[in-house]
Amino acid sequence: MHSSIPPVPREPGLLRVASVNVNGIRAAYRKNMADWLAERDVDILCLQEVRAPDAIVRELLDESQWNILHAEAAAKGRAGVLVATRRTPNSAGEVLKDQPVATRSTIGEEYFDDSGRWVEADYVLPNGQTLTVVSAYVHSGEVGTQKQEDKYRFLERMLVRMPELAEHSDHVLIVGDLNVG
């Protein structure tokens, strides 16, 4: 995995978050994602289109280094999103409380529950406030198809969920591949 964007120097006291559509985590690791990730020194990692069973995800990311929350798609080889927080201190010697205080892998509509397109994790920040992190994958659509209707339905559900999250948490970060451009 290569990026033309160089790593940014770390600012003490600030969280570093990376969100990446990996288009298959096994392929990303074959393209040196582990090195890319080490260079970025992130505190929170969000991935989309993971496309792998949970056991493989945990092996590749190394559970001794990361607390992993993975929403796997029921359809083999499709979608899949995750939020992971590092278990070890970052280069500034800081660590976010690695275990989320609550997690959810649904956007609130049963139709999407096993789609592997939405996962939420609540973390307590050092100041005691709550941060909710969402990793989302909205599939691309094709005009006039059921796939497009499903996409619109998912986006509509996001519009309902966002104010709910704002009520629930002090801070909300929604990242992912939203396919809305």
Q: What are the language-model segments listed below?
A:
Residues 37-38, 118-128, 157-170:
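Short amphipathic alpha-helices and their capping/turn segments at secondary-structure boundaries
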Residues 64-67, 154-181:
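Metal-dependent phosphoesterases centered on the DNase I-like endonuclease/exonuclease/phosphatase
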Residues 46, 133-135, 171-176:
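A structural signal for short, well-ordered beta-strand segments and their strand-loop junctions
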